[in-house]
Regions:
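Active-site entrance/lid segments in N-terminal catalytic domains of soluble metabolic enzymes
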Residues: 1-131
Length: 131
């Protein structure tokens, strides 16, 4: 990829101008996002039913999903300590605000939101490092 300029998103500088898409359920998780970020791109974790591997997913889906946001981010960060890692969070999710707050608490570099208008997103990330 010689000659391609780095990608700049706010204060973030991405060595390779590649943003991995958020593919849920169970595709864009910590392992893939970490691998992409390790190679210099932006690794994206999808929060769509992210907690499907949690033991209480069937009985407490909301809590399982919120908890898995942190654990999947940690998995990605272990693979790419200095990489750019974010989340894809659909506005249409019932617990959108909670997903965003969990991603911010985990230390996400950025959040990509679609499936609706992310009107509340700037207020939810205000005062954090998350773009």
């Amino acid at each position: 990829m010689k000659g391609l300029p780095e990608l700049v998103i706010g204060d973030l500088k991405v060595k390779r101008p590649v943003i991995q898409g958020g593919m849920g359920v169970g595709v864009s998780l910590g392992q893939l996002a970490g691998a992409v970020a390790k190679e210099g791109g932006v690794g994206i974790i999808s929060t769509a039913q992210i907690g499907f591997r949690e033991p209480d997913f069937e009985t407490n889906t909301r809590a399982a999903n919120i908890r898995a946001i942190g654990s999947e981010f940690q998995r990605a960060r272990e693979t790419a300590p200095d990489g750019v890692i974010g989340f894809n969070i659909m506005v249409a999710l019932k617990d959108y605000d909670e997903h965003v707050k969990a991603a911010v608490d985990a230390g996400a570099d950025l959040i990509v939101s679609g499936a609706g208008l992310p009107i509340e997103l700037p207020g939810l990330v205000e005062g954090s490092i998350t773009l």
